[in-house]
């Protein structure tokens, strides 16, 4: 794939293109994946991404759940605008393990730092998997040793890393953005326990752009997450481990202007977010809920979340049932101002409720397709927001009822 003019950027996804994808597309990054034996399945379960420089700029966003996993606490404490590498394990969240969890997260970083020739604080640590089980540190430390010896700048190495961080994901999530002589790569995981504060997920973004300061990286990431990852709300649950990490190597030697860079980071975050929604646990319907006519954008987002979390609404979507009454019943519980007599609803562009009353043909709207767009107007203002969710299927219940067994 060739680079594109900055006014016509080239963006590809793991689901939409056979082009090179992932965290090793940008210059100055190495990656590796191994099977350390953490997952009972025997699948790969550890990954390492190293920023080979010359820069080591970084920015990160974390879960807002008050119960945080040890790797989140460790990485957050060392988030000073620089990271040289990140170690990731899947199959174990290292969450709710007390002092032992903190010790294990720190030991993981120390082992990686020793092998990579940097300080422990230069290494971010991320974990994903079952909460409450202590990490098998003999396997983790052996895995770090093996990872360091396998680091490679090939595209395949990045693809392997994307697969190694998967838990109940069915497919790896990767993306790439080509600017004018510089690029962005990304990989992510997460299909369940997805709600605001990034949704349950780990996302790693790399760029070979030269950023003058960590402030530029933070501004781009902080500006992108509210309208991308924070808008995914699959099941109303927020993970203890959510982390989005951006690392910049500067290897291209090119500094894009801030507006261009911010837009590119947003585009990549949106790309990964849509892949997360598409692979959500048990998903058969991808549902976008747009609420307008609210007093503020924040109110609109709150109302959209209330609808998206309503189990009766989600069941209706699973059954392709254009039951607009469930939308009204759900949104009526939102703690925002609305005109209860002037709410309008449409499914896939077809009005099904006007002024809180059923519209002609409402019961016959076809929702059999995989994508459903729900639009709601609260009738009191100009606020508008969109939240992405899914249906509630038999498979979702099956997957989550058997998760720890």
Swiss-Prot record:
Biased composition (Polar residues): 1-18
Keyword annotations: Acyltransferase, Amino-acid biosynthesis, Arginine biosynthesis, Autocatalytic cleavage, Cytoplasm, Multifunctional enzyme, Transferase
InterPro entries named in the record: Arg_biosynth_ArgJ (IPR002813), ArgJ-like_dom_sf (IPR016117), ArgJ_beta_C (IPR042195)
Biochemical pathway: Amino-acid biosynthesis; L-arginine biosynthesis; L-ornithine and N-acetyl-L-glutamate from L-glutamate and N(2)-acetyl-L-ornithine (cyclic): step 1/1; Amino-acid biosynthesis; L-arginine biosynthesis; N(2)-acetyl-L-ornithine from L-glutamate: step 1/4
Matching Pfam families: ArgJ
Region (Disordered): 1-21
Catalytic residues of the enzyme: 200
Record field: catalytic activity: N(2)-acetyl-L-ornithine + L-glutamate = N-acetyl-L-glutamate + L-ornithine; L-glutamate + acetyl-CoA = N-acetyl-L-glutamate + CoA + H(+)
Gene Ontology cellular-component terms listed: cytoplasm
Entry-linked PANTHER family: ARGININE BIOSYNTHESIS BIFUNCTIONAL PROTEIN ARGJ, ARGININE BIOSYNTHESIS BIFUNCTIONAL PROTEIN ARGJ, MITOCHONDRIAL
Role played: Catalyzes two activities which are involved in the cyclic version of arginine biosynthesis: the synthesis of N-acetylglutamate from glutamate and acetyl-CoA as the acetyl donor, and of ornithine by transacetylation between N(2)-acetylornithine and glutamate.
Protein family according to the UniProt entry: Belongs to the ArgJ family.
Protein's UniProt name: Arginine biosynthesis bifunctional protein ArgJ
Organism: Corynebacterium jeikeium (strain K411)
